[in-house]
Regions:
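CN hydrolase (nitrilase-like) catalytic-core segments centered on the catalytic cysteine
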Residues: 75, 117-118, 258, 265-266, ...
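Short, solvent-exposed cationic patches
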Residues: 335-349, 370, 375, 437-458
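Soluble catalytic regions of membrane-associated enzymes that act on cell-envelope
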Residues: 203-331, 341-344, 350, 354
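Short, conserved active-site loops that position catalytic residues or coordinate cofactors/metal ions
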Residues: 24-40, 63-68, 222-223, 255-268, ...
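Generic structural signal for well-ordered alpha-helices
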Residues: 96, 100, 245-249, 338, ...
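Active-site catalytic loop in hydrolytic enzyme cores
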Residues: 71-81, 107, 126-156, 282-285, ...
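Conserved beta-strand and immediately adjacent loop positions that scaffold enzyme active sites
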Residues: 217, 306, 337, 410, ...
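Membrane-embedded alpha-helical bundles of multi-pass enzymes
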Residues: 2-207, 381, 394, 411-417, ...
Length: 473
């Protein structure tokens, strides 16, 4: 009997580990997170609390190994930082298993099903507030290949996606555990089915709904170059920028209205900035298209990671400085201003790369009327899908279109529903470009108006459920 229980325990742990390994990380399979916690949750009530925690901890830790190469060898985090990150995430999952187990052992499958997503969203929200990387690693990004699911973000923000996924997982685990009376399990099936089906129906409806919009033709362009060129003398930077300006003239199709170039195409001093501005003002006038250029502006006392906007008539109309810099990697000074450009098709906003990991900034832009976000970026190749989709989800949350050009990444054009309209990967040593049309429309979402109300609801509900659990103990 003991050997049978041990085999069941190991099988449950390995099943959850495998599902989380392939369902999270840089290239997730969207349906796997819906099932990943189920085996562990289903068996948890039959185990002692210590065993249930260790099972959840081990399963999630093994699943997180899908990020090891990225963390250790691509972004080269210190080993102790990686271990701390992986262990904390596994502890959070293990505690979530214990939280659900406490309700299952008291015969409350409905509360157990609610407890898991409520706990998870509360933890994700606290992490997003406290972490310098905000929503990086959020469960919601695993769902970017399932467009109906992510539409709920226009109401709840990113938090509603995580909730729906783990509500299904929690309910399935509770049902398989056998906890509760038959009528309770029947009510649970009906309630969760209604909620999950409603979210899919809403998503399908939103994808099919349309509003009067204006099409904008956008060209995205980038060239991957060695780090030695970026860190090299200013002459090399100016040469590369000149090549970009020539490529803009050559490759932008007639009728292009906006051209987005990547983040940090070069580092230039104040004395050379006028030359760069003249170069791209001329290119903008020649193509009759607005140009967004990402550069590092170096002053005697500081440097700024900037995005500069040149209008179709060749004028420098805006300079945006990146708000959210990567700790320990970007030494530049953070900006704090929004830049919005009123154009014939609507109001365009500027952000840079990591800025779009932070929901609040995009929500502020949307509240100010932005309907197209122009985003220079710089990724690490292996994370190109994930980081582009994080930005796409900001567009879904807030009802704006997105044009994102990432060196060492993807050139991505998406609409305000998250549909990818044009996309291609960059390549080393040569220019790559893609052109597409995107409909832009002023469409303020419920999430834009109300903010993180759903996350706060989950935090409040978690406090109530935790107090109830402590009182019952």
């Amino acid at each position: 009997m003991q050997s049978r229980k041990l085999v069941l325990l190991i099988a449950a742990g390995l099943a959850s580990a495998a599902l989380s390994y392939f369902g999270t990380g840089l290239h997730p399979i969207w349906w796997m997170p819906w099932l990943a916690p189920v085996p562990v949750l289903a068996i948890a009530p039959r185990l002692r609390s210590s065993a249930a925690f260790l099972l959840g901890f081990a399963a999630w830790l093994i699943g997180e190994m899908n990020q090891w190469n990225y963390l250790r060898h691509v972004i080269e985090l210190p080993l102790q930082t990686i271990i701390l990150f992986l262990v904390i995430s596994a502890v959070v999952f293990g505690l979530g298993v214990l939280f659900v187990r406490s309700f299952l052992r008291r015969g409350s499958p409905l509360l157990a099903s609610l407890a898991f997503p409520i706990y998870w969203v509360a933890c994700e929200y606290v992490n997003a507030i406290a972490s310098p990387h905000s929503t990086w690693g959020n469960l919601a990004y695993t769902q970017m290949d399932c467009l109906p699911v992510i539409q709920i973000a226009s109401i709840t923000g990113i938090w509603g996606i995580s909730f729906i996924v783990f509500l299904f997982a929690g309910a399935t685990g509770a049902l398989l555990s056998g906890a509760g009376k038959p009528w309770q399990r029947g009510a649970l099936v009906i309630a969760v089915s209604v909620v999950v089906c409603a979210s899919f129906v809403f998503g399908k409806w939103r994808l099919e709904s349309t509003s009067p919009a204006q099409p904008v033709t956008v060209t995205l362009m980038a060239r991957d170059v060695p780090m030695s060129i970026y860190l090299g003398p200013e002459e090399e930077a100016l040469k590369l920028l000149g090549e970009y300006a020539d490529e803009v003239r050559r490759a932008a199709p007639p009728g292009t209205q906006a051209i987005v170039l990547p983040e940090k195409t070069g580092r230039v001093s104040e004395s050379a900035l006028a030359e760069v501005d003249a170069l791209f003002s001329s290119a903008a006038a020649a193509t009759q298209a607005a140009i967004v250029l990402g550069i590092v502006r170096r002053t005697p006392g500081a440097a700024f990671n900037s995005s500069r906007f040149y209008s179709p008539d060749g004028k420098l109309e805006g300079n945006y400085d990146k708000h959210h810099l990567i700790p320990g990697i970007e030494p530049e000074i953070a900006g704090d201003k929004h830049v919005l450009l009123d154009q014939p098709p609507g109001r365009w906003g500027l952000q840079i790369c990591k800025d779009m990991d932070f929901p609040k900034l995009s929500r502020e832009y949307a509240a100010e009327g932005a309907n197209l976000m122009l985003v220079p970026a710089w990724d690490f190749n292996v994370d190109r899908w994930l980081h582009s989709r994080m930005a796409v989800l900001r567009a879904v949350e807030n009802g704006f279109a997105l044009a994102r050009s990432a060196r060492n990444g993807l050139l991505t054009l998406s609409d305000n529903r998250g549909r990818i309209l044009a996309e291609t990967a960059t390549a080393p040593g040569r220019f790559v470009s893609v052109t597409g049309k995107v409909n832009v429309v002023r469409e303020e979402t419920f999430y834009t108006r109300t903010g993180d109300w759903f996350a706060w609801l989950c935090v409040s509900a978690f406090i109530v459920l935790a107090a109830r659990t402590i009182a019952a103990a």
